[in-house]
Amino acid sequence: MRKREYLIASLAMLLLLVLSGCKGNKLPDGMDEDKVSSAGLAVMSQLTKGEYEEVYDALREDVREQTSADAIEEMMDTATEGRGSFKKVKDSMVTGVTEPHAIAVIGAKYDKKSVVFRIAFDTEMNLIGLDVRGK
């Protein structure tokens, strides 16, 4: 009986931990969740279509100086290697962070495995960061 109670308590704690990770932090003042989500999905769409120059050009100037369209392409190639073709968006959320910006987190389904896109925007909705990884 104790073993079963321990198992139930452990599963409840695990579920609580997982669910708490799904809730995003508050967005900075003036940022709209729908706008961040839409902008993130638009950038993700460009990335899945191979429009790396366009994404590079959309980066805020100071961020653009630190990367290249080739680096963005390499990040995508690494994240999607062996996963097949993009199929659909599985889920998405928007979260704030301690810095004054917001991140659209998008889970995308590919033929074989999923990919997670993290796309960051400053308070003026300038693209300031990209992170794409296989799940």
How would you describe each model-predicted region?
Residues M1-S10:
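Bacterial N-terminal signal peptides that target proteins for export
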Residues S10-L16:
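Hydrophobic helical h-region of N-terminal Sec-dependent signal peptides
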Residues V18-G21:
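C-terminal motif of bacterial Sec signal peptides marking the signal peptidase cleavage site
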Residues K23-K26:
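Bacterial signal peptide processing site
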Residues D29-D34, T95:
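Transition segment at domain starts
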Residues D32-T48, A58:
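Short, aromatic-enriched amphipathic alpha-helices that serve as compact interaction elements
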Residues E53-P100:
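Short solvent-exposed beta->alpha transition segments
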Residues M93-K135:
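Exposed beta-sheet edge and beta->alpha loop/turn motif
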